[in-house]
């Protein structure tokens, strides 16, 4: 019963973590590209 409650929370937390990390990596990548061009 507890698992059924925790599973969606775990999935949401993992998904949010991946999204935040992906956004940070994209920003870093864009920064590196602009630095290389400059």
From Swiss-Prot:
Its main location: membrane. The gene is psbY. The chain crosses the membrane at residues 2-20. One of its GO terms (molecular function) is manganese ion binding. It comes from Prochlorococcus marinus (strain MIT 9313). HAMAP family: PSII_PsbY (MF_00717). Keywords: Membrane, Photosynthesis, Photosystem II, Thylakoid, Transmembrane, Transmembrane helix. The keyword Thylakoid applies. PSII is composed of 1 copy each of membrane proteins PsbA, PsbB, PsbC, PsbD, PsbE, PsbF, PsbH, PsbI, PsbJ, PsbK, PsbL, PsbM, PsbT, PsbX, PsbY, Psb30/Ycf12, peripheral proteins PsbO, CyanoQ (PsbQ), PsbU, PsbV and a large number of cofactors. It forms dimeric complexes. One of its GO terms (cellular component) is photosystem II. This is Photosystem II reaction center protein Y. It holds the Pfam family PsbY. Belongs to the PsbY family. It comes from the Bacteria. It is found in: Cellular thylakoid membrane. GO terms for biological process: photosynthesis.
